Amino acid sequence: MKVTQIRQAYLDFFAQKGHQIVPSSPVVPGDDPTLLFTNAGMNQFKDVFLGFDKRSYTRATTAQKCIRAGGKHNDLDNVGYTARHHTFFEMLGNFSFGDYFKKDAIQFAWDLLTQVFELPKDKLLVTVYAEDDEAYAIWKDQIGVPAERIIRIGDNKGARYASDNFWMMGDTGPCGPCTEIFYDHGEHIPGGPPGSPDEDGDRFIEIWNNVFMQFNRDEAGVMHPLPKPSVDTGMGLERIAAVLQHVHSNYEIDLFVNLIKAAKDTVDGAGGENCDAQSPSLKVIADHIRACSFIVVDGVIPGNAGRGYVLRRIARRAIRHGYKLGARKPFFYQLVPALVKEMGDAYPELRAAQDKVSEVLKQEEERFFQTIANGMEILDGALAGGAKVVDGETAFRLHDTFGFPLDLTADVCRERGVTVDSEGFEVAMQKQRDQARAAGKFKVAQGLDYKGVPTRFHGYETLKHEGAKITALYLDGSAVNSVKAGDAAVVVLDNTPFYAESGGQVGDKGELRNEAARFTVDDTFKIQADVFGHQGEVLEGELKVGDTLNALVDIALRNDTMRNHSATHILHKALREVLGDHVQQKGSLVDASKTRFDFTHNAPITAEQIRRIEDIVNAEILDNSATSGKVMSLEDAQKTGAMMLFGEKYGDEVRVLEIGSSKELCGGTHVSRTGDIGSLKIVSEGGVAAGIRRVEAVTGQNALHFLQGLEDKINEAATILKTHPGDLVNRVAQLQESLRLAERELEKVNSKLAASQGDELAGQAIDVNGLKVLAARLDGADAGVLRETMDALKAKLKTAAIVLASVQGDKVSLIAGVTADSIAKVKAGDLVNFVAQQVGGKGGGKPEMAMAGGNDPSKLGAALDGVKDWVASK
């Protein structure tokens, strides 16, 4: 069976067993900041297992895209050199949310493996947790696995319940034993069974893990049985494919054979000259194109932090391996079509984003090949003057700032008989590791402990609700029965018109009051998905649990917020229309004063594009079309073509919002007609990260106030320049022309000065082995004068090596020049670095001309005096 057939057979089997086939969630988890990348099939169901989310089904099956290349789960360094490590892999899984348990889960697994996949029963071996007699009995008595092929695994990791066969989500929370199924590759493969001293060998390979969540562990470590036990399973698609295709390495399955062949072809085409088809580097490239492509599909752009940094590391590792094989121009991005051919049918989002993925990877590849060139230049500078060791800080700066791999630094140094201070590099690297944020571990939310009825939200229809009942009160994070005047507290109501912060829209403000008390609401947030907390202060009286009161939203603030939120939807649509369909929302903040919108785009937005975007949005506003919000199933919403955000978590039912030509899923509050927005003006645009742009815009009265402010500044500028506001542009143009003429006259003066100084300084040159050497100061000269003087001296001296210096305050400016006939002997970059290092600086440039700076003028005289001897030594 091919990989595509195995994947489908798994899903079909469980669909026939009453499971809902759930699409893979993105590899970038949009609703879990504790997780760098999706690394297991159960990630998208975490809130279901924790009881925070409910689905319309109790059985699910998935083929989940997973990444393990950052944080706790990091396989990057092993990829390409082992049979089973990957940065990207697919996890097949079936899940029970309080439905079936051990008996059915084990039976399902056995039937699929032995009947559908037709694996020999005597090739399968299972493990159970040592104390899980129930699972042991099911395997032995129901399934019929011989006792000698069932292995009990106890607490083998140094603590109670710390076992290969006991799974815990965290220090507290859901947990339980697991049973694992292993495939025996045969006696000819080294290695022992699980639990033996030789278990790390390759003979027995785990192919499936069934986790039985049956306990809730409290802070004291006590295990409490869960009322509805659940099942979480995972089987690596690549591993089971290797077993079914009778190969020992995952890289020998059909999918990887095809990708490795494509990798060889692209590397050969980029200069590899028939590279070794068995090279581990080709496995690295084939693996990494999967991880990089799916990360880009889900909206990540290469960068220097977080997920963007991980993406950059993976891509550059692949490019580095291509470079080792001889590639000298971009090749990696050319693998995207081959990947789409292998996986595009299973994951249509990959096929849809093919051009975008290719372009992003191509740009990164072009940058890295330039980085290699730049890194070589920096290395050349570090090795100038006969250095025999590249210090660890320099090697780490090349690695961390410029992306220049340490192994490439070591290769270059080795060729020149130079060593790298690897210990110093590790010290710098460890310092960075110590500062890095941990990622990848589940943490159960530590919110307010609320167990009452959910909050009913009425804020779409009204901004006032009478008779709301207090269901809970919190003071300093703890539940209390009452709060009094002066207390900063959180109030939970059974009914509210207050919108709780979510989807980028801030929470409502306002007031809660009855005849005896008054509470000002400064913010509204979600304690749970359907429980709203009203945060603020008791202004008068006392509030008690069970009291009823009137909830009054601040109308002016809500209306301004609604204008901005509705405008954001139209703005999003306009951005895609003007800039392209690659635009994806990466974040937003909507409050009463403005809307801030972050999105994917690789270049600044031009003034012309901003004007077009504004015109589109304001035209929609002037149309004054009615808006509508309809609640429907997620499946029906997808059929309408409503825009959905990558990584966003949606429930079974969603709200489809239509505003003008925009149609998106949104639970926020909005205007009734587009004309209610008034107008929109973009007030700023800029970059916030690599490949991420941000626009801020204002609407309604705020847009008017912004334009009035600009008008005031124009009038003030016109007054200063003694002209009418309507003639301001002409007046500025006149002043620019006057300035240009003055600068031209100054250039003429500087040229004459440089020529005269050149004539004067030329006589100070000293002959050193047939080369005229000059080192002189021109204090007060700027960079332009230094360059012109250098050109004049080179023309006059013909065969020369020259250093000129200028001091302004505590800053030293240096320029070195070498005539073309002398660069074989002396290079300007080496010469300027010789002087710069003595005055606390460094620099670089071309062999004929180089510049540098320093911050220690006191040593300049001695440095210039040493130029003659330095040239003589060459």
Swiss-Prot record:
Native species: Polynucleobacter asymbioticus (strain DSM 18221 / CIP 109841 / QLW-P1DMWA-1) (Polynucleobacter necessarius subsp. asymbioticus)
Binding residues for Zn(2+): 565, 569, 666, 670
Localisation: Cytoplasm
Gene Ontology biological-process annotations: alanyl-tRNA aminoacylation; negative regulation of DNA-templated transcription
Cofactor(s) essential for the protein: Zn(2+)
The family this protein is said to belong to: Belongs to the class-II aminoacyl-tRNA synthetase family.
EC annotation from Swiss-Prot or TrEMBL: 6.1.1.7
InterPro entries (alphabetical): aa-tRNA-synth_II/BPL/LPL (IPR045864), Ala-tRNA-lgiase_IIc (IPR002318), Ala-tRNA-ligase_IIc_anticod-bd (IPR018162), Ala-tRNA-synth_IIc_core (IPR018165), Ala-tRNA-synth_IIc_N (IPR018164), Ala-tRNA_ligase (IPR050058), Ala_tRNA_ligase_euk/bac (IPR023033), DHHA1_dom (IPR003156)
This protein's record includes keyword Cytoplasm: yes
Enzyme class: ligase
Domain of life: Bacteria
The record's free-text note on cofactor binding: Binds 1 zinc ion per subunit.
Domain notes: Consists of three domains; the N-terminal catalytic domain, the editing domain and the C-terminal C-Ala domain. The editing domain removes incorrectly charged amino acids, while the C-Ala domain, along with tRNA(Ala), serves as a bridge to cooperatively bring together the editing and aminoacylation centers thus stimulating deacylation of misacylated tRNAs.
CC per GO annotation: cytosol
Keywords noted in UniProt: Aminoacyl-tRNA synthetase, ATP-binding, Cytoplasm, Ligase, Metal-binding, Nucleotide-binding, Protein biosynthesis, RNA-binding, tRNA-binding, Zinc
Cited function: Catalyzes the attachment of alanine to tRNA(Ala) in a two-step reaction: alanine is first activated by ATP to form Ala-AMP and then transferred to the acceptor end of tRNA(Ala). Also edits incorrectly charged Ser-tRNA(Ala) and Gly-tRNA(Ala) via its editing domain.
Reactions catalysed according to its record: tRNA(Ala) + L-alanine + ATP = L-alanyl-tRNA(Ala) + AMP + diphosphate
Record protein name field: Alanine--tRNA ligase
One Pfam family matching this protein: tRNA_SAD
SUPFAM superfamilies associated with the record: Class II aaRS and biotin synthetases (SSF55681), Putative anticodon-binding domain of alanyl-tRNA synthetase (AlaRS) (SSF101353), ThrRS/AlaRS common domain (SSF55186), Translation proteins (SSF50447)
Keyword Plastid: no
Gene Ontology molecular function, alphabetical: alanine-tRNA ligase activity; aminoacyl-tRNA deacylase activity; ATP binding; tRNA binding; zinc ion binding
